[in-house]
Structures are given as structure tokens and as C-alpha cells.
């Protein structure tokens, strides 16, 4: 009996090793080239300021895209007033392949925190990347998500789902709005927790999502206004329609989820976590 189990385990481990080697080889072939998205309306002086903040000496060494104000309005008009978005594209982003999950740094960004970007970028589908967001002076930074994902598309050669990008933009805006009422860190944690529960439970109905929002707010000792609750509910309706991998989501925004776990929050296990735990249990049995 144990011999047969060992054969199954050996075969499974071989398959995992082959898959890991393939991914590793792909990462070597892909290299670690860096990509930049610049606001198309930056003046020369503003551009110099942004490049300095992004730690870029020679722009020719990078794959560069320019994000227009028209693109910013296309993605954000549904969630922000035109006056907030403005008439100039200024947000600029540098993206480097590699790292452990999504790592974010910001400069001159007043509305969006690093955690908010990390949460939203994970929703959009970004994986294992180092992201730096900068403005020439204090700006909201809400449009930077568009630039980050456009740079990510260039880096991976894969088109980002419009549905995921739309949900991520709404998530960034809603988290920022909720933060004005309950605080930045609290908003980051609440959004991450609600999203995890919605995705892991496969919640789709308004009633189920509202229950999750209330449950999560209670766990974090947060009191939500009716307006903020409605904003989150509308966003989660959209997120529930996306094909998000809960393991990947938690891996990419691990700083937030690790903090929640340290606070005593327990999460449902995703497929790969269950698989890992199954192997561990099996090895314990075979000892």
C-alpha cells in the first residue's frame, strides 16, 4: 500500500518539478528588462523631475509608452468626476519584472497608497513585478494604474483583460474614497478581506456579498457608512464575475494578507494551498 502511495507521490512531484523548471526557464529567457509609462502631458521640466524620482538616467534603456489624458478619462470617467481626473496626463510608472509578489513604491502620490495599488494590481492580473509610481508634484495617482498595466502588457506580451482592468480601476478609486472615512490602512485591509471572501466563497448574490462586507467590517472593528457599504458592494459584484485565482491573489498582495493573518483573521484555502497541505499530511503518514 505504502509503495503504491510513494509511486503516486513521486509522479506528482516529478510533474511539479518539470512545471517549475519550465517556469524558471521562461523567466530566464524573458530577462528583466524594465518598462516605463509616462504621462503624455508632462512638460520637459516635469518629465525631468519624474525621471529622477523613478531613478532613470537614460530613457533609451527602457521600453517607453505614453499614457494620454483621453485614455485616463476612458478608464476613469465612470468612477471619478472629470475635474478630479483633470485635463493633463501626469502619472508615470516604472515596472520591472521579478520580485516576490507585487512590490510598490510611490512618490508625490496623495490619494492612493502603496497597499491600494498592490491590491488593485493583483485584481488586474499583475504578477511578480516591482512598480514605482511618481508624479511631478502631488497628484492623486488614480490614473497610474492604467500606465502600470500598459507597461505590464509590454513586459509580458499578453493583453490584460479589460474586465479585470476596469474592476481594478474601480477598486483603486473606491478604496481611496472609503479611506477618507475609515483611514488608509483600514481601507486596504477591509478591501483585501472582502475580496478574498467573495472570491473564495464564490459569492455572487447581493445578499451574500452584503453579508461578507458586514462580516469583514465586524472582524476588523470598522464602522461603515451606508454610502461606503454601497460602493464596496457594487465593486464586489463586478469582482465576483472575474475569474480570479485566490492563491495568486494572496501571493501577489502577500504583505496585506500576512498582516491580516497576524491579526487573527483566518482565510479559506485555495487549490494549491490544499494540495501542499495534502502532500504534507501524506508525508507525515508515511514517516
Name every feature range the model reports, one short phrase each.
Residues 31, 51-52, 209-212, 216-221, ...:
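Anaerobic metallocofactor- and corrinoid-dependent redox/one-carbon enzyme cores
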Residues 122, 127-222:
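Soluble oligomerization/assembly scaffold segments of membrane-associated complexes
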Residues 110-113, 159, 179-184, 202, ...:
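Long, contiguous ectodomains of secretory-pathway proteins
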Residues 46, 50, 113, 117, ...:
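Stable alpha-helical elements in mature extracytoplasmic
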Residues 2-25, 279-282, 286:
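Sec-dependent N-terminal signal peptides of Gram-positive bacterial secreted proteins and lipoproteins
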Residues 25-130, 154:
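N-terminal, leucine/charged-rich tether regions that mediate assembly and partner docking
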Residues 39-42, 109, 140, 186, ...:
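Catalytic cores of large soluble enzymes that bind and process phosphate-bearing ligands
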Residues 222-287:
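Charged, long alpha-helical assembly modules
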Amino acid at each position: 500500500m505504502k509503495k503504491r502511495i510513494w509511486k503516486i507521490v513521486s509522479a506528482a512531484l516529478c510533474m511539479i518539478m518539470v512545471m517549475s523548471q519550465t517556469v524558471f526557464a521562461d523567466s530566464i529567457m524573458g530577462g528583466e528588462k524594465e518598462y516605463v509609462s509616462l504621462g503624455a502631458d508632462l512638460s520637459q521640466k516635469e518629465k525631468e523631475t519624474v525621471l529622477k524620482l523613478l531613478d532613470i538616467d537614460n530613457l533609451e534603456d527602457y521600453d517607453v509608452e505614453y499614457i494620454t489624458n483621453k485614455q485616463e478619462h476612458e478608464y476613469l470617467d465612470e468612477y471619478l468626476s472629470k475635474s478630479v481626473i483633470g485635463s493633463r496626463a501626469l502619472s508615470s510608472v516604472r515596472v520591472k519584472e521579478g520580485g516576490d509578489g507585487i512590490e510598490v513604491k510611490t512618490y508625490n502620490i496623495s490619494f492612493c497608497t502603496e497597499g491600494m495599488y498592490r491590491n488593485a494590481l493583483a485584481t488586474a492580473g499583475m504578477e511578480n513585478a516591482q512598480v514605482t509610481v511618481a508624479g511631478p508634484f502631488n497628484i492623486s495617482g488614480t490614473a497610474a494604474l492604467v500606465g502600470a498595466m500598459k507597461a505590464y502588457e509590454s513586459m509580458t506580451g499578453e493583453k490584460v483583460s479589460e474586465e479585470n482592468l476596469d474592476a481594478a480601476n474601480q477598486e483603486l478609486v473606491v478604496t481611496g474614497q472609503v479611506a477618507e472615512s475609515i483611514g488608509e490602512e483600514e481601507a486596504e485591509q477591509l478591501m483585501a478581506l472582502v475580496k478574498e471572501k467573495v472570491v473564495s466563497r464564490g459569492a455572487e448574490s447581493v445578499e451574500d456579498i452584503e453579508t461578507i462586507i458586514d462580516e469583514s467590517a465586524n472582524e476588523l472593528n470598522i464602522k461603515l457608512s451606508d454610502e461606503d457599504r454601497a460602493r464596496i458592494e457594487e465593486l464586489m459584484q463586478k469582482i465576483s464575475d472575474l475569474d480570479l485565482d485566490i492563491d495568486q491573489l494572496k501571493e501577489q498582495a502577500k504583505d496585506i494578507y500576512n498582516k491580516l493573518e497576524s491579526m487573527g483573521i483566518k482565510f479559506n484555502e485555495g487549490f494549491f494551498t490544499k494540495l501542499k497541505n495534502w502532500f504534507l499530511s501524506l508525508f507525515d503518514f508515511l514517516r
